[in-house]
Amino acid sequence: MAILPSKARPATPWAARRAGEDYGVHADPDWRDIDWSEHLRSAEIDGRRVQYVDMGSGDGRPVVFVHGIAGNWQNWLENLPRFAQERRVVALDLPGFGGSEDPAADVSIPGLGRAVEALCDQLELGEVALVGNSMGGFIAAETAIQFPERVERLVLVSAAGITIASLNRNVVKAWGRAAVMAGARSAAETRMAILRPRLRHMVFATLFRHPTRIPTETIFEIAAGAGRRAFRPTLEAMLDYDFRDRLPEIRCPTLIVWGAEDMIIPAHDADEFERSIPGARKVVFDDTGHVPMVERPMTFNECVLEFISEPRGQQTEDVGKPAAGVSS
């Protein structure tokens, strides 16, 4: 059984030239112009320190961003400044990742959902729009199931939770051990991989559709801050939890965003989420991999902002309507 069940295959390096003008650009406002130390905070959740970014203000509901496995808050660098122009935004390092301490108890998807809820409660955020990528989407959906009064809008970006439930556990665990060893490369080795186009393509082709088009600074930040301490226990937690039969319990407006060429989580999982969550809508970004918010940030930002800004109780066909190069 394949570890990566997607039918997508890596793009050739020269295909990057045809990726479109919105691929691999810096979004506006540019995150490089921000002193992020001014927005870094920490909170105590279950006796452990959790790091997060808190910025922006506005009349709209706050937006909370949840990263994927081996990720960190920097996964949202291309998105936070734009969202912060209109509302308060919070992006956390999940327990065991980035600048957050390891969790106090065994890692589980429901437990991570409770950690997200605890942070929202501590920050007195009220109802939020919750945005999660990959494992973060798994956690975001679980949070919406556990705490429906907290999540007013839900955005699942290449979310885990469907195909992973049917994978061979032993094979995936073996892959996880190999991934941890591969991820333990030194800062110098990582820098070499990022700066050399051919090597960058080889190392990051599973994550990004066109790695050589992603800005070097963005990859540096994501790679340098990625915490891998909790990788294996979190991977096992994902394998141990199946919430597919509970997805119909999600009642908030939900937008599903995917990359058509996602090599990590197959695009057909988006169809399953759409079928399972009442009233869910789906947007698929063409020629895009596992992290649409990094690969096509400007298109992603406007698509999601339009969705979460929709008046309460109103559902419009045009909200979440894809731009050129995006299908629904």
Regions found by a protein language model. Give the residues of each.
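Short beta-strand/loop motif that positions the catalytic acidic residue
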Residues: I250, I256-W258, D262
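Flexible "cap/lid" loop of the alpha/beta hydrolase fold
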Residues: I145, E152-S186
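Catalytic active-site module of serine/aspartate enzymes centered on a nucleophile-bearing elbow/loop
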Residues: A280-S328
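Conserved alpha/beta-hydrolase catalytic His-Asp/Glu region
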Residues: E189-E249
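Gly/Ala-rich beta-loop-alpha elbow adjacent to hydrolase catalytic centers
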Residues: G132, G136, A140
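Conserved HGGG/HGGXW glycine-rich cap/lid loop of the alpha/beta-hydrolase fold
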Residues: R48, V53-G99
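Conserved acidic catalytic loop of the alpha/beta-hydrolase fold
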Residues: G111-V128
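Alpha/beta-hydrolase fold catalytic core
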Residues: M1-V63, Q85-R87, L125-G126, S309-S328
